[in-house]
């Protein structure tokens, strides 16, 4: 509107250096959380606040569970925030009504490893990503979507609710995701089941997504953009 030239610098991640091999710290996470080896793990890597749309993740998982002869375990990684516990309580009730197992892992997941107040082992999110079979990101709105970039970094298939910033700034790059517009449809369930049962399709999608991120959301891009801006300012 003001006809001022600008340069957009996106959120970035270290896609030049793929995740390192696990050091084994998180190997006991499933046992500690009561997750059996035959359960499909769906990770919701967010806090428990209404704008994260976690009820959509519960809906997806419960519908998949009804169609598959396998149990689904939804792992919600973080605690509820200062917005209160009502949303969390509503989600617990919804999961029970749908006979869905949910691991509320917030007391055991933190920014860094260590022990909690009860002397229990604390994991970080990077300990959990490798064991996820699928990731849900059904946010109603976001400032950008750092957890989505993190999901691409760990090469995991993902469901995304098409919040506005995603539609404007991320979707145009052509990522392969299971996308929804505020509801879990029959096609959503079919597409997710297809990914859960086809490793080659998962590899195709995640490799495609990673390559896009390497080009457009990497530290390399950030360095290049900043160098150009600094050079331009010195002219």
Identify the meaning behind each predicted range:
Residues 36-52, 58-61, 74-76:
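Conserved donor-binding/catalytic core segment of Leloir-type glycosyltransferases
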Residues 140:
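Aromatic "clamp/platform" in nucleotide-sugar-dependent glycosyltransferases that forms part
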């Amino acid at each position: 509107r003001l006809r001022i030239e600008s340069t957009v610098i996106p959120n970035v991640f270290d896609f030049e250096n793929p995740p390192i091999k696990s050091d084994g710290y998180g190997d006991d996470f499933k046992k500690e959380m009561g997750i059996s080896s035959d359960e499909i793990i769906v990770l919701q890597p967010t806090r428990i606040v209404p704008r994260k749309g976690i009820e959509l993740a519960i809906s997806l998982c419960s519908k998949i569970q009804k169609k598959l002869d396998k149990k689904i375990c939804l792992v919600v990684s973080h605690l509820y925030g200062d917005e209160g516990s009502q949303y969390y309580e509503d989600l617990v009730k919804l999961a029970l009504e749908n006979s869905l197992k949910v691991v509320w892992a917030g007391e055991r997941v933190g920014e860094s490893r260590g022990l909690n107040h009860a002397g229990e082992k604390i994991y970080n999110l990077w300990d959990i990503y490798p064991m996820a079979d699928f990731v849900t990101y059904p946010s109603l709105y976001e400032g950008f979507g750092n957890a989505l970039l993190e999901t691409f970094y760990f090469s995991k298939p993902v469901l995304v609710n098409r919040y506005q910033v995603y539609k404007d700034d991320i979707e145009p790059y052509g990522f392969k995701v299971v996308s929804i517009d505020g509801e879990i449809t029959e096609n959503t369930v079919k597409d997710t089941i297809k990914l859960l049962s086809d490793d080659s399709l998962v590899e195709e999608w995640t490799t495609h997504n990673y390559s896009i991120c390497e080009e457009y959301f990497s530290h390399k891009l950030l360095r290049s953009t900043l160098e150009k801006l600094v050079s331009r300012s010195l002219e």
